[in-house]
């Protein structure tokens, strides 16, 4: 499955329209290129409808948001819905401030989101519970996050993916636990945002958004493991360079052989 989707991604080179934050925009563009897709960053409300019509996936990331930008995201999201373009929402910092929480919930209410990807605190907040967050980072993982994510997936009718020590992905029917990854990935800012770009890249070509999201998490985690094993890596700076190289050099064979996942099918 993963081999097929990665090959398809690199053959088709899907266009990924980002409305994302100013902190990580360059990294998101570069990781999209590295995995094999094409990034475009278009924010102007006057052009987002036209741009998203030509895209194969849309990323909505509220990391550095304003009310005006949220309005633009919703405008783009509704157009994506009309044209069958998957919408990937990264509710960065939901739970940290009322603006972020209300904005994320508003997007979910007004746009048919395909995938919600966040940390445990963000996903808990969107489910109506209280997540422990500091700034935009979860400071403590929820013990029952798989149940919380499952319930949110059922409620919203979409895939919910939670990044953490063990990643959790569910569509309300199946739950996958991904154990690929490395602690070094948490030493650089933007890995979560970059993961969202990779999720969008896979979902742009996958027939099923659960499968696309799962393969993206596996690919991202394997790249992190391999980068951390590079003898030239001495800290966050060299790790980041090695990580981009590993994303670029991922092969279908490695993706198939080095995955660490547990899959549960709900009754």
UniProtKB/Swiss-Prot annotation:
EC number annotated for this UniProt entry: 2.7.1.50
Protein task: Catalyzes the phosphorylation of the hydroxyl group of 4-methyl-5-beta-hydroxyethylthiazole (THZ).
InterPro entries linked to this entry: Hyethyz_kinase (IPR000417), Ribokinase-like (IPR029056)
Top-tier EC class: transferase
Keyword Electron transport annotated: no
Catalytic activity: 5-(2-hydroxyethyl)-4-methylthiazole + ATP = 4-methyl-5-(2-phosphooxyethyl)-thiazole + ADP + H(+)
Organism per entry: Caldanaerobacter subterraneus subsp. tengcongensis (strain DSM 15242 / JCM 11007 / NBRC 100824 / MB4)
Gene Ontology biological process: thiamine biosynthetic process; thiamine diphosphate biosynthetic process
Family: Belongs to the Thz kinase family.
Molecular-function annotations in GO: ATP binding; hydroxyethylthiazole kinase activity; magnesium ion binding
Protein name, UniProt field: Hydroxyethylthiazole kinase
């Amino acid at each position: 499955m993963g081999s097929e989707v990665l090959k398809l991604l690199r053959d088709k080179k899907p266009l990924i329209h980002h409305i994302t934050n100013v902190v990580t925009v360059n990294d998101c563009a570069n990781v999209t290129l590295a995995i094999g897709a094409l990034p475009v960053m278009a924010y102007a409300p006057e052009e987002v409808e036209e741009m998203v019509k030509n895209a194969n996936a849309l990323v909505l990331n509220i990391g550095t948001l304003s009310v005006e930008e949220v309005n633009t995201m919703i405008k783009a999201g509704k157009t994506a819905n009309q044209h069958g373009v998957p919408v990937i929402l990264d509710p960065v910092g939901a739970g940290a401030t009322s603006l972020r929480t209300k904005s994320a919930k508003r997007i979910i209410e007004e746009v048919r989101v395909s995938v919600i990807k966040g940390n445990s605190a963000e996903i808990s907040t969107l489910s109506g519970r209280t997540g422990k967050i500091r700034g935009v980072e979860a400071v403590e993982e929820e013990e029952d996050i798989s149940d919380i994510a499952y319930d949110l997936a059922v409620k919203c009718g979409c895939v919910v993916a939670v990044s953490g020590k063990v990643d959790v992905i569910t569509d309300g029917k199946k739950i996958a636990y991904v154990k690929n990854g490395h602690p070094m990935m948490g030493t650089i800012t933007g890995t979560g945002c970059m993961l969202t770009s990779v999720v969008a890249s896979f979902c742009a070509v996958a027939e099923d958004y659960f499968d696309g999201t799962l393969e993206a998490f596996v690919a991202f985690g394997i790249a992190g493991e391999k980068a951390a094993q590079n003898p030239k890596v001495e800290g966050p700076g060299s790790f980041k360079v090695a990580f981009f190289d590993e994303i670029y050099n991922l092969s279908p064979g490695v993706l198939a052989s080095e995955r660490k996942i547990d899959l549960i099918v709900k009754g």
